[in-house]
Amino acid sequence: MYQRDQDKQKSLLAKAAIKYLEKGMVLGLGTGSTIDIFISELSKFESLFSSLKIVATSKISAKKARDNRMNVVAPDKYLELDICIDGADEVDRNLSMIKGGGGALLWEKIVAYRARKRIYLADESKQVARLGAFPLPVEIIDYGHEWSAAAIEPLFKSVRLRKEATGNIIKTDSNNVIYDCLIKDEENTANLDSKLSEIPGVVTSGFFGQF
């Protein structure tokens, strides 16, 4: 898919998602390129966005929302969110997803869990028959992360520490590291996520099933 066509789809998805918003809602705001477009589209409706209370899933999304004059609040202000709007890296036919390409998987999962309604914006390039072409992000605490990586390595085809082009290790907003892991053929992603949760040091993975 050409980038222009993909961006057009993202814009259409963003406009459709805005229709689910009502004045005064507490909105969980995702992270990523699709959400950047969503923020841009939402900024055109000042009477709506000015009434929203926004809980962001990353410092980057929080800044972009504030730059567009939106009201970003701390997550501890509300025990429950009205709606969460986010993107996805892969979505299968059962609506299971791989997320975390933008590095915000932990905060995205926390926010999604607290939302009464969840909307995920995924253009056709993200829709797959089976999860796994996109590497599964696994968030691991910084302390001894090499040990945890060695423990998860047998579960995957390969694991790779996420780094910048300069070679610097990328840290999440929680100061953790991320390993991008290629899933083995025919692996059950839900079972894999369960196995990962048993390994000390693993915080969460980018697998999003049913809450």
PLM region spans:
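Conserved phosphate- and dinucleotide-binding cores of soluble alpha/beta proteins
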Residues: 2-8, 59-211
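N-terminal active-site beta-alpha-beta segment that forms phosphate/nucleotide-binding
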Residues: 2-86
